[in-house]
From Swiss-Prot:
A Pfam family per the record: 7tm_1
Name of the protein this chain belongs to: Melanopsin
Database matches in InterPro entries: GPCR_opsins, GPCR_Rhodpsn, GPCR_Rhodpsn_7TM, Opsin, Retinal_BS
Membrane topology: Multi-pass membrane protein
Segments in the Cytoplasmic topological domain: 93-106, 165-187, 259-295, 350-469
Organism field: Phodopus sungorus (Striped hairy-footed hamster)
Length: 469
């Protein structure tokens, strides 16, 4: 009886001695820590034997035109430069602007830091290796490169989850946010995010999976190709706890946010217009717009990582033999491009960020088309913030004196946004009747200018991306 045929080469590639990776490149990669991984990789190649077998890797470098390396290298270079400059701008602007320097926005700064480091550590190495059409930095360099990509990618995903949770609590459970917005607690959240990312990125150094070359052998990642229980267990848990579970949390948060806003709008329909209700509606609009900005960033991040995740899941399912070098390298570049979305989205849709750029980076503000009349966010923030605090001292009279003093002191210390402070009062009102709409937000919001169109009708909740008033 004939024995079953062995695995075949990926489509479009020839199999034979050229299926082996460069002996020079991998001669330093024979450490004992990779014995199990290398042994499994050998089983995929029926022609590998002897010294060549120890150097074999899952993706060949033959039959790949030079221009493929150069194109990928050029793209990753542009992505890296854009990511570094854009995220540096976000970090600088958020740190310089008083109106943006809030504990909640520390999550955005953390996202910008992780995206900047992703561009800084990944793009130059990928670009240099693409120019030479091979990996240049040895086994240690490969492990460090892949480790940085893993920890920074996980940090970004968990930070986006924390941003979604923050928006969820502010809009749907405002009373729960009293005292939770301090700088110390935010710092603990950020520390937890980085420790969580490290916990999932370190196991390959201790024998649970491994960091190996991938695609065109000009970049590295965790080993998702080897079909062993150990490697597959790591891949499965990694996807569950750093991708699918955070994604489910984000979906839950935004469904809850949308339902809360819709129910608030319905509760306020049919009642006579009042200045308090207009202020409530404007603040609800502003908070919803900020939530939409975060949602856009999250969606772009997930879409960027979706192709790469699909490739890894195909290999996890046991179909790694259908993967070609292009099917691994191109999704890897798309995933690394997730680092450029954050600054672009904020430059287009975040009104306070645009105004802060015009103030602190006037040349960039001109490019964004921001009017010079909006170049003083700090001054308006101080005025509005003082008004909010003074008004809350009377409007929050339903809270006992010690707790009220604690709440106001906490807000003054950590710099709550107007909407977050307003939400505390709004959530404490009855859930039905005219009082739920007419008395929800009698704190110190600057009175909105009246207009003939506004006197007899409650403004509808704007779901567009126009600037908040």
């Amino acid at each position: 009886m004939d024995s079953p045929p062995g695995p075949t080469a990926p489509p479009g590639l020839t199999q034979g001695p050229s299926f082996m990776a460069s002996t020079t490149l991998h001669s330093h990669w024979n450490s004992t820590q990779k014995v199990s991984t290398r042994a499994q990789l050998l089983a995929v190649s029926p022609t590998a034997s002897g010294p060549e077998a120890a150097a074999w890797v899952p993706f060949p470098t033959v039959d790949v035109p030079d221009h493929a390396h150069y194109i990928l290298g050029t793209v990753i270079l542009l992505v890296g430069l854009t990511g570094m400059l854009g995220n540096l701008t976000v970090i600088y602007t958020f740190c310089r602007s008083r109106s943006l320097r809030t504990p909640a926005n520390m999550l955005i700064i953390n996202l910008a830091v992780s995206d900047f480091l992703m561009s800084f550590t990944q793009a130059p190495v990928f670009f240099a290796s693409s120019l030479y059409k091979k990996w240049l930095f040895g086994e240690t360099g490969c492990e460090f490169y892949a480790f940085c990509g893993a920890v920074l990618g996980i940090t970004s995903m968990i930070t986006l989850t924390a941003i979604a949770l923050d928006r969820y609590l502010v809009i749907t459970r405002p009373l729960a946010t009293i005292g939770m917005g301090s700088k110390r607690r935010t710092a603990l959240v950020l520390l937890g995010i980085w420790l969580y990312a490290l916990a999932w990125s370190l196991p390959p150094f201790f024998g649970w999976s491994a960091y190996v070359p991938e695609g065109l052998l000009t970049s590295c990642s965790w080993d998702y190709v080897t079909f062993t229980p150990q490697v597959r267990a790591y891949t499965m848990l990694l996807f569950c706890f750093v991708f699918f579970l955070p994604l489910l949390v984000i979906i839950f948060c935004y469904i809850s946010i949308f339902r809360a806003i819709r129910e608030t709008g319905r509760a306020c329909e049919g009642w006579s217009e009042s200045p308090q209700r207009r202020r409530q509606w404007h603040r609800l609009q502003s908070e919803w717009k900020m939530a939409k900005v975060a949602l856009i960033v999250i969606l772009l991040f997930v879409l960027s990582w979706a192709p790469y995740s699909t490739v890894a899941l195909v290999a996890f399912a046991g179909y790694s033999h259908i993967l070609t070098p292009y099917m691994s390298s191109v999704p890897a570049v798309i995933a690394k491009a997730s680092a450029i979305h954050n600054p672009i989205v904020y430059a287009i849709t975040h009104p306070k960020y645009r105004a802060a750029i015009a103030q602190h980076l006037p040349c960039l503000g001109v490019l964004l088309g921001v009017s010079s009349q909006r170049n003083r966010p700090s001054l308006s923030y101080r005025s509005t913030h003082r008004s909010t605090l003074s008004s809350q001292s009377s409007d929050l009279s339903w809270i006992s004196a010690p707790k009220r003093q604690e709440s106001l002191g906490s807000e003054s210390e950590v710099g709550w946004t107007d909407t977050e402070a307003t939400a505390v009062w709004g959530a404490a009102q009855p859930a039905s009747g005219q009082s739920s709409c007419g008395q929800n937000l009698e704190d110190g919001m600057v009175k909105a200018p009246s207009s003939p169109q506004a006197k007899g009708q409650l403004p509808s909740l704007d779901l567009g991306m126009q600037d908040a008033p």
